[in-house]
């Protein structure tokens, strides 16, 4: 049986180690933000890591709901990850949450 490619808006556990300096580290959930056409053919994708620490919110961040729990999407940690780093699909974000992430990305990247 063929495995369906990761899709924009999916949340996967991703192994970010090894990391350097202040890069995101450890295995944590991240939302896929790259487009589905690229996700089907490339061996890498763009992701935004999520954290359960929602105490402080910066302009380049967004609060989203993952399986009923609040998470902070950190657009300042937007990164490209090999599909080999993907461990397990944990859910999918709502359209509203993806709009909030897109807004955070625009702020972070000055678009």
Which positions does each model-derived feature cover?
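Conserved functional hotspots at enzyme active or ligand-binding sites that engage polyanionic ligands
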Residues: 1-111
């Amino acid at each position: 049986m063929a495995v369906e490619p990761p899709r924009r808006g999916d949340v996967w556990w991703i192994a970010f180690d090894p990391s350097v300096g202040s890069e995101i580290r450890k295995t944590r959930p991240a939302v896929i933000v790259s487009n589905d056409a690229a996700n089907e053919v490339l061996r890498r994708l763009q992701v935004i890591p999520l954290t359960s620490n929602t105490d402080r919110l910066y302009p380049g961040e967004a609060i989203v709901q993952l399986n009923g729990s609040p998470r902070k999407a950190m657009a300042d940690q937007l990164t490209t990850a090999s599909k080999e780093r993907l461990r397990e699909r944990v859910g999918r974000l709502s359209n509203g949450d993806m709009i909030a992430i897109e807004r955070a990305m625009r702020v972070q990247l000055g678009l």
